[in-house]
Every structure is written in structure tokens, then in C-alpha cells.
Curated annotation (Swiss-Prot):
The keyword Lipid metabolism does not apply. Pfam families: FtsJ (PF01728). GO terms for molecular function: rRNA (uridine-2'-O-)-methyltransferase activity. The gene is rlmE. It is found in: Cytoplasm. It catalyses: uridine(2552) in 23S rRNA + S-adenosyl-L-methionine = 2'-O-methyluridine(2552) in 23S rRNA + S-adenosyl-L-homocysteine + H(+). S-adenosyl-L-methionine binds at G63, W65, D83, D99, D124. This is Ribosomal RNA large subunit methyltransferase E. The active site is at K164.
């Protein structure tokens, strides 16, 4: 029964995806994914990413957020991206393919970052959904906890963090953990985020270091 529900949900997602105005807009503009519009909207509102900044993009593939960030930071900035999945090269983006939960990959990523000098950590990571709500929620929370932990390793004082989080079990605890290390934390639901989706974005600023 659960498998049938999962298949029905997957088909509904596909139907919505191909009829989505932001998917069509991304295709028309030659962009890698509709996710770029979410980051663009957040950045216009919160001004997280600015010219000359250094940015880390976790779960970067297919590259929509990196594509946007590198245009904003320009030649004097830096974008370091990482994903377990492959990603086509983007000029100006230093991409590392691998799972940063593995020590060797994490060491390689931290070497490229070279100290706590990052202005913005951003994460659009999401776990593969199985249809089991409790298991999916736990997997999703694990990923956002990893992203928050990365902030402690690479963010400079007063740096910023933007992360996709799914509302549900563990959400309030995660908000508290984020507020403990940032001066301000806001919740954003971009217009390009599907209304039915439980996803929101936390925008955290003023990293306490």
C-alpha cells in the first residue's frame, strides 16, 4: 500500500514539474534548475551574497545555486561547491564531487576553503524520499544538521547561512540550534517554492563564531 502511495506521489510530482511555470522559465533562460529562482528571491530580500564574497554550496548539483552565486560574487569572489552527484562545470566554481560525510572528501573540501573565511554557507540538500514520512523526516534533518555543522568549520564571524528545511519532526529543535549560533534567523517561503511542499528556507545571519 505504501509503495502504491509513493508511486502516485512520484507521478503527481512529475506532472507538476513539467507543468511548472518556473521549470519552463528556467528552460527558456538556459538555467540548470528552477531552484535558482528560490535563491535569487531570498538574496534580493536578504542580501546575503554580495560581490567579492566567498561562498560554499552544499548539495550543489545540478548547479542552479552555484550558477547564481558565481554571477553575484564576480571575479573577485569564490564559490566552492560539493555534491555526491556529478555536476557539469561552471566557470568560476570550484566543484568537488564526493560525499563530505567521508573524511577524505571533507578534508579535500576544507583544503579548498582554506580556513574559516567563508561569508555564506548555502545548502539546498534534500534526502531521497521513500514515502515513509518518519524515515524521510529523519534523513532530511540529518542533512541539515550536517550543513549547520559545516558552518562551525568554515564560516567567518558574522557570516550567513541559508538552508532548505522540511517542516515536521525536529524542525523546532533545529531552529533553536541555529539561533544558538547566529544572531538572527528568519524563515522564508519563496514564491517559486511549491505551495504544497513542506520546504522552507532558514536564513541565518550574524554567525557568532
Amino acid at each position: 500500500m505504501a509503495n502504491k502511495k509513493h508511486k502516485a506521489s512520484s507521478q503527481r510530482w512529475l506532472d507538476e514539474h513539467f507543468d511548472d511555470e518556473y521549470v519552463k522559465k528556467a528552460q527558456r533562460l538556459g538555467l540548470r534548475s528552477r531552484a535558482v529562482f528560490k535563491l535569487e528571491e531570498i538574496n534580493i530580500k536578504d542580501r546575503l551574497i554580495k560581490p567579492g564574497m566567498k561562498v560554499v554550496d552544499l548539495g550543489a548539483a545540478p548547479g542552479g545555486w552555484s550558477e547564481y552565486a558565481v554571477k553575484v560574487v564576480g571575479d573577485k569572489g569564490q564559490v566552492v561547491a560539493c555534491d555526491i552527484l556529478p555536476m557539469d562545470a561552471i566557470v568560476g566554481v570550484d566543484f568537488l564531487e564526493g560525499d563530505f560525510r567521508e573524511e577524505e572528501v571533507l578534508d579535500a573540501l576544507l583544503t579548498r576553503i582554506n580556513g574559516k573565511n567563508i561569508d555564506v554557507v548555502m545548502s539546498d540538500m534534500a534526502a531521497n524520499m521513500t514515502g515513509n514520512e518518519s524515515a524521510d523526516s529523519a534523513r532530511s534533518m540529518y542533512l541539515v544538521e550536517l550543513a549547520l555543522d559545516m558552518c562551525s568549520q568554515v564560516l567567518k564571524p558574522n557570516g550567513a547561512f541559508v538552508v532548505k528545511v522540511f517542516q515536521g519532526a525536529g524542525f523546532e529543535d533545529y531552529m533553536k540550534a541555529t539561533r544558538a549560533v547566529f544572531k538572527a534567523v528568519k524563515t522564508r517561503k519563496p514564491e517559486s517554492s511549491r505551495a504544497r511542499s513542506r520546504e522552507v528556507y532558514l536564513v541565518a545571519t550574524g554567525y557568532k563564531g
